[in-house]
Design a protein with these regions (language model features):
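Nucleotide-activated chemistry modules centered on ATP-dependent adenylation/adenylyltransferase
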Residues: 1-285
Length: 285
């Protein structure tokens, strides 16, 4: 809450990024605690790949409507239609294309700070990122240009065209997130809990069969009891085998896990050892 208030106080036009996932659902609850009974001092924005799980989009729209806040949607499909980026094709992921849609929206609306739900335990690139992460006029992240953060002293000063990414959940872990969800009774999309789903095993991951993910000639779809540890583009987000249908059961699973949710279930992080850092240098979340 302190970090959100700090960003709202120091920055002229911040925005809260909301994907409909568990981390951004926690961010919304923290924003409620920080600013209610007034309205949020920033709009809510989703960078939509167009390949999202329907349950997540339904939850996104319902949750924002319940809050009575403004929702902006930065569309990857629009970036493709206008020639800003190339369509990766039927088997490609649009996850990396979110960078262009995000930066275009930041420029369009004049945002100087974007509040996101990234955590340091997710990936080694995020582990070395500041709570207030400085981005240059091109939206790019340079680890060598990050500002020192001593105690709870944060600098939100930027020049015109520059911006910040703010990560209030930086020091939280996946276990912290789920414990907070349980304590606060935070609603989540149903795909976070165990359910029957048709999946395809590909490259060691269980991808949900969908309009964008179909079995290849040497593959077959099978119905399994699974849940998702993280949500993203359906073409690169894998499920895990699970029987956990309650928050308490998920907490027990997470406590035994030794691999982060991104490391275990995100194909877009497997392109190279520096996949996340490369994307951040381009302007990713």
């Amino acid at each position: 809450m302190f970090i959100m208030r700090e960003v709202a106080a120091e920055c002229e036009r911040p925005v809260l990024l909301f994907s409909g996932g568990k981390d951004s659902a926690v961010l919304l609850r923290l924003a409620e605690k920080a600013f209610r009974p007034g309205g949020f001092p920033f709009p809510i924005m989703h960078v939509d790949t167009g390949h999202n799980f329907p349950e997540v989009i339904d939850f996104r729209d319902r949750r924002v409507a319940e809050l009575g806040e403004e929702l902006l949607v930065a569309s990857v499909q629009e970036s493709i239609d206008t020639g800003r980026v190339a369509d990766p094709g039927p088997e490609g992921t649009r996850n990396r294309l979110q960078t262009t849609a995000l930066l275009d929206a930041i420029n369009k609306y004049g945002f100087d700070a974007a509040i996101g739900g990234a955590r340091r335990d997710e990936d080694k690139a995020r582990a070395k990122e500041r709570v207030l992460s400085f981005r240059d006029t091109f939206g790019q992240w340079d680890p060598k240009r990050q500002r020192p953060e001593l105690w709870q002293l944060y600098s939100g000063q930027v020049q015109p065209g520059e911006s910040l990414r703010a990560f209030p959940l930086s020091d939280w872990t996946e276990l912290d997130i789920w414990q907070y969800i349980g304590r606060e009774s935070i609603e989540l999309p149903s795909i976070y809990y165990a359910h029957k789903r048709s999946v395809i095993e590909r490259d060691g991951m269980l991808l949900a069969e969908s309009d964008w993910v179909k079995p290849r000639p040497d593959e077959s779809a099978v119905t399994e009891t699974v849940r998702f540890r993280t949500v993203g583009d359906a073409t690169c987000t894998g499920a895990v085998m699970s029987e956990a249908v309650t928050v308490e059961e998920i907490i027990a699973e997470v406590a035994l896990s030794r691999v982060s949710e991104r490391g275990a279930t995100r194909a877009d992080d497997r392109f190279s050892e520096t996949s996340m850092e490369d994307r951040k240098r381009e302007g990713y979340f």
